[in-house]
Amino acid sequence: MGCRLLCCVVFCLLQAGPLDTAVSQTPKYLVTQMGNDKSIKCEQNLGHDTMYWYKQDSKKFLKIMFSYNNKELIINETVPNRFSPKSPDKAHLNLHINSLELGDSAVYFCASSQ
């Protein structure tokens, strides 16, 4: 077996905000092989207008990937186009990732605000 078969991409997904908030993301943890396509779902029932996706890499740098407000998507230009947010409605902002790479291993979390 080559090294490529043994490598996998690991995601740790955190629920955004304090425990009494109503922002959730699923799955909570995601372990998969490189090259796979995966989605992370984020939902809020707080009636907020804006939702966000953040990424924190192994160097502990936190960066905003996407924000979505009133049908307007703002994309961080440094995010590879393999990452694409989808918002079927105001309460959801799902993150789709194509062709996962080892460098995608990070903590991803969503948040919302008014």
Swiss-Prot record:
S-S pairs: C42-C110
Domain Ig-like positions: 22-114
Main location: membrane
CC per GO annotation: plasma membrane; T cell receptor complex
Keywords for the protein's UniProt record, in alphabetical order: Adaptive immunity, Cell membrane, Disulfide bond, Glycoprotein, Immunity, Immunoglobulin domain, Membrane, Receptor, Signal, T cell receptor
Localization: Cell membrane
UniProt xrefs under InterPro entries: Ig-like_dom (IPR007110), Ig-like_dom_sf (IPR036179), Ig-like_fold (IPR013783), Ig_V-set (IPR013106), TCR_beta_variable (IPR050413)
Superkingdom as given in the UniProt entry: Eukaryota
UniProt KW ATP-binding keyword: no
Biological process annotations from GO: adaptive immune response; cell surface receptor signaling pathway
Signal peptide: 1-21
Carbohydrate-modified residues: N76
Assembly information from the UniProt record: Alpha-beta TR is a heterodimer composed of an alpha and beta chain; disulfide-linked. The alpha-beta TR is associated with the transmembrane signaling CD3 coreceptor proteins to form the TR-CD3 (TcR or TCR). The assembly of alpha-beta TR heterodimers with CD3 occurs in the endoplasmic reticulum where a single alpha-beta TR heterodimer associates with one CD3D-CD3E heterodimer, one CD3G-CD3E heterodimer and one CD247 homodimer forming a stable octameric structure. CD3D-CD3E and CD3G-CD3E heterodimers preferentially associate with TR alpha and TR beta chains, respectively.
Function of the molecule: V region of the variable domain of T cell receptor (TR) beta chain that participates in the antigen recognition. Alpha-beta T cell receptors are antigen specific receptors which are essential to the immune response and are present on the cell surface of T lymphocytes. Recognize peptide-major histocompatibility (MH) (pMH) complexes that are displayed by antigen presenting cells (APC), a prerequisite for efficient T cell adaptive immunity against pathogens.
Protein name (Swiss-Prot/TrEMBL): T cell receptor beta variable 3-1
Species: Homo sapiens (Human)
